[in-house]
Amino acid sequence: WGRGGRCVAAVGVWVQGGSGGGGWVGEAGLLVGAGGAGGAGALGGGATGVGGAGGNGGTAGLLFGAGGAGGAGGFGFGGAGGAGGLGGKAGLIGDGGDGGAGGNGTGAKGGDGGAGGGAILVGNGGNGGNAGSGTPNGSAGTGGAGGLLGKNGMNGLP
């Protein structure tokens, strides 16, 4: 396992996916383990000033584990805000990961919040990420679907 890596662990070993930088994903072990959190997007600067997108949360192991949280979108320093990362999908038993918040834009559009990850059997869906402020504001992320024994996640704030 490691930064933005995928863990290929033996069955039954609890493992945590790595927390990747923006755009990277930390994956859990194949059967059991929690997905790692996506890293935050880079601060926008230079000619465009556009903030980087947050990394997506890692997917949990197939049987047990929670999805990783999506990373926050980067602040647009003179440009649009970056999109929040998606929440990771849960295993059969576990909650979906929360979506990352969109980054704020400067004189440009705010980043969209990431959608929450879904649950499958026993677990709640992840909450959607809040929208980034800007001109106009970004869109809020939608909550993830709950499992058969669980609740849907809440939508993010606009």
Predicted regions mapped to residue ranges:
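Long, compositionally biased tandem-repeat segments
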Residues: W1-P158
